[in-house]
Every structure is written in structure tokens, then in C-alpha cells.
Amino acid sequence: MIWTRAEGCRVWDENGREYLDLSAGFGVAALGHRNPRVMEAIASAPVAHALGDLADAHVTQELRRRLPWPAKLGVTGEDAVEIALRTALLAKGKPGIVAFDGAYHGTGLLALAATGFEHFRAPFTAWLPGPVHRRAYGEDPGPLPDDAGCVIAEPVQGRAGARVPPVGWLEQLRERCDETGALLIVDAIYAGLGRIGELWPGEDVADVICVGKALGGGLPLSAALFVRRELERAWHLGPEDVLTHTHVGNPLACAAALVVLDEVPKLLRRVRAAGARFAEEGWQGAGLLRARAGDAQAAERSGVIVIPAGLDGSLISATPALTISDEELDEALSRLRRTTDAWSRSS
């Protein structure tokens, strides 16, 4: 399918067919496609240059001021994870990573090593760094290995199918980290910025929170947020930044992010209410990060876009715009109900 137009929670293909989009581009379009405030912010951004890395634009500095903790910016979610993992090595001097089955942290080699999907890792095993100690998601990892500089976990797993850990699990990880001095990294790239009804999931326990996807309002932007503020100093290694990219802090993305930070807090109650509607229909997860058994292609034929998900690919995932209306949600769920009922009968 080729999208030729997108507005809010609806997209149109090259044949002019309209779809209800429950993917929001893997959660990126949290305020809806072509959100008017985001579009206006991009169009009117006081951009003196298009680069991000050479020097901060004023709008980039404003974003840094608006974030609740010191931040090292990236372009992709994977960048934020790489920053967080390298922070642990710099701060603790230990290369070991404790990660979890079903985790998805990115496909760069360091983030990939921590990712829990074997089919992503297998072609590149010879190059993957480590050691990585893999544990069962949602369970007590036990005493951490001596070489572990950090634990990295998602507050709700996205690609694995909206897996929600038991209440208190992140606090349990915090206790395990405190036993050895390891850092706790919360990868909230998918679940953060309102997706599960919280702005900064894990903020009470994390040393570093990774955010991305929704942050740039549709443009590429991510950040590793140093909740433990002194960790920022781990990167004071000399006159030149040793981990950067050409477009870090791109002013257009930063202008869009300022709108996201304005608007998402107003939507948290709405997210929880809409999430309850999904739960009534048998969708697991939290907020507007949801999954259930189903067929993404069948859903597409019914005019609804969802994402294949799950450890074995047998689930469909819904991550709609946080702005989805009751009418759009009812329409999408009605179509999906017929689709999943038919899929269940044929399975």
C-alpha cells in the first residue's frame, strides 16, 4: 500500500480508498497525521540553519529547557538506547547488560544485542557486543551478574504485543540495581509520551529514560533523559562529542517536539478512557498500546490499519493517535470485531 494522503487518524491509498489508521506510524503520529499545531510549528520555526549538530538553534535550546531532566538528543529511538547503554559503561565501567525476552530496542549493534527477538539478532551474531544476560520479562531477574552495568526494560513491551509486566516490577528491578549499583534504563520510546496514559513511564525508578517516536511530532527526534542528573557528566570526555549525528537537534523536529510537550499532557485522561474501550473488546495492554490475536492483512481489507505483533507474529497491535475520537474508535473496533471473529473461526 502507498499512502498518498494522511489527516488525523485517517489515511488514503493511491486508489483513493480511505482507511482508519490505528498504527499512527508505529506510534509516531501521537497527535495525528499532519496535526495543525505541529504543521504550523514546523512552518513558522525560526530556523537559521537546517543542521542540528554543528550548533544548537534557539528552538533546540528551548526544547532542552522544556524537558524535565538533562538530555542527550538523538535522531532515532535506537540512538537514545545507544546513548543510555553507553552511559552505563561510562558511569559504571562494566560492559554487561541485563535485558529481557520480547524486548525491542533497535537494530544498531549495541541496541540489537539487547533486543529479545532472535530473528533480528541471528544474522549479525558475530558482530554483537556483550555480554548480554537475558531474563524473562515481568519476572524477578534475580541477583545481577557482577559485570552488569545496567538493566534495560520497557514499561510495556510494544513489538512483543503490548505485554504488561506485573504491578511493581520496575520497582523490583530498581531494588536489584541498587544491590550492585547498576543503572536502570527505562526504554519508553514506544510507551512514553502519553501512549500508556503516562508522560514519563518509570520516572520514579529510572536512572535514564529513553524517548522517541512521538517526541518529534512525526519528524525524527529522540532523547536519553538523565533522571539521575549527574549521569550527564559521564559524557564530559573532552572538547569533542564522541557520540553524535549530523542531524541531532534538528530545529524543525525540535519545534514540533515543543508542541508535543504542550499537547500530550492534556490527553492523558483521554488515553486512559480510550484504552478502557480497547480492554472491553479483549485487547491486552495499557492505554493506547494494545494487542490481540488477529490478521493485519484482513484488518487492512476491512479498512483498518494495524501492525503485526507478538513473539510469534500471531497478534495485531493498535497504537492509534492519542487524539482519536470516540466515533473513529467505535468505527474501527466495529470493523475489527468482524475481522477478528472471522479470523478466529478460520484458525
Predicted regions and their residues:
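Conserved N-terminal phosphate-binding loop of PLP-dependent enzymes in the Aspartate aminotransferase
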Residues: 1-347
